[in-house]
Amino acid sequence: MSEAKSGPEYASFFAVMGASAAMVFSALGAAYGTAKSGTGIAAMSVMRPEMIMKSIIPVVMAGIIAIYGLVVAVLIANSLNDGISLYRSFLQLGAGLSVGLSGLAAGFAIGIVGDAGVRGTAQQPRLFVGMILILIFAEVLGLYGLIVALILSTK
């Protein structure tokens, strides 16, 4: 009888896995994006040290991806209670996977574009605007996952 109202005992496991997936996958994407872009900045700064601050944009954008995962992980963690239903728990898992995996993909895209863009901008400064536009499109991938995760986690 109590399972119909509150769900099985193991239901909270899936919600916790959603919070973990949100944080872990988005942090992996952000770390990769930061490392890959940072490598490009380090290589570029040997020849053009005056461009370091201008080239830091990909690193900042990669860091924002981790914030998306943190927001969803906190929302999921705050909604946990003893009697969570299995339906709600699977919604939380879906929300975590949504923001986490889209953050992972966005982080990879930001890292690759940031590395190549920073190195290219050092040789041809007119490439900067193109790099920023591509970075924005890569960042939006993570934002799409955040929007879906917010919809799922607040259902």
From Swiss-Prot:
Transmembrane segments: 11-33, 56-76, 93-114, 132-152
One Gene Ontology cellular component: vacuolar proton-transporting V-type ATPase, V0 domain
Keywords: Cytoplasmic vesicle, Hydrogen ion transport, Ion transport, Membrane, Synapse, Transmembrane, Transmembrane helix, Transport, Ubl conjugation
Sites marked Essential for proton translocation: E139
Cytoplasmic topological domain residue ranges: 34-55, 115-131
CDD domains for this protein: ATP-synt_Vo_c_ATP6C_rpt1, ATP-synt_Vo_c_ATP6C_rpt2
Disulfide bonding pattern of the chain: none
Superkingdom of this protein's organism: Eukaryota
InterPro entries hit by this protein: ATPase_proteolipid_c-like_dom, ATPase_proteolipid_csu, ATPase_proteolipid_su_C_euk, F/V-ATP_Csub_sf
Molecular-function GO term, any one: proton-transporting ATPase activity, rotational mechanism
A Pfam match: ATP-synt_C
Predominant place of localization: membrane
Subcellular location: Cytoplasmic vesicle, Clathrin-coated vesicle membrane; Cytoplasmic vesicle, Secretory vesicle, Synaptic vesicle membrane
Lumenal compartment spans: 1-10, 77-92, 153-155
Membrane topology listed for this record: Multi-pass membrane protein
Protein family according to the UniProt entry: Belongs to the V-ATPase proteolipid subunit family.
Function: Proton-conducting pore forming subunit of the V0 complex of vacuolar(H+)-ATPase (V-ATPase), a multisubunit enzyme composed of a peripheral complex (V1) that hydrolyzes ATP and a membrane integral complex (V0) that translocates protons. V-ATPase is responsible for acidifying and maintaining the pH of intracellular compartments and in some cell types, is targeted to the plasma membrane, where it is responsible for acidifying the extracellular environment.
SUBUNIT field: V-ATPase is a heteromultimeric enzyme made up of two complexes: the ATP-hydrolytic V1 complex and the proton translocation V0 complex. The V1 complex consists of three catalytic AB heterodimers that form a heterohexamer, three peripheral stalks each consisting of EG heterodimers, one central rotor including subunits D and F, and the regulatory subunits C and H. The proton translocation complex V0 consists of the proton transport subunit a, a ring of proteolipid subunits c9c'', rotary subunit d, subunits e and f, and the accessory subunits ATP6AP1/Ac45 and ATP6AP2/PRR.
Protein name: V-type proton ATPase 16 kDa proteolipid subunit c
Originating species: Ovis aries
